[in-house]
Amino acid sequence: GTDGLAIMPAVVAEATPPYGGTGYFVGSPKDFDRANALDVSQLFTFLRATQPEAFEKLAMGDPSDPKDINRLKFLTRLSAEIGKRGVIDVLRKGVEHGPLHFDLFYGTPSEGNEKAAALHSQNRFSVTRQLAYSMDETRRALDLGLFINGLPIATFELKNSLTKQTVED
């Protein structure tokens, strides 16, 4: 018997399934690193899947720990490159971090190139609702944020005339 104790099924960590079966992933606001403006979960999932050896060489003790020094160094470097070169250039050319190079997007493969097709299929397009971006106590949030492999592409502030929200609000 179980002596009145409930038996809990084993919990398996699994990526959120694609949004509506169309290749979109649902991002979580808690995965958004406000200091660096990156969806860390989507970024690290992409890097682990496409460049596992380089990702391991980052030597993060715990990639989910925001205080891990190697995690901080990598995210700060990536954020600085985005600030300097822009997100499109970083997606196209990747980023250098010490001796390592990281590709951050895989473009449309040529026909018959199975390796490129496999890498392209690992790109992660995600949508995050209620994206808190302010670093202060106001906790201001955007209605939607769009990301490719954890890098921000677009934000949306949705308005509703039925609730008297307009572009001026």
Protein language model features and the residues they cover:
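An alpha-helical interface "stripe"
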Residues: 1-169
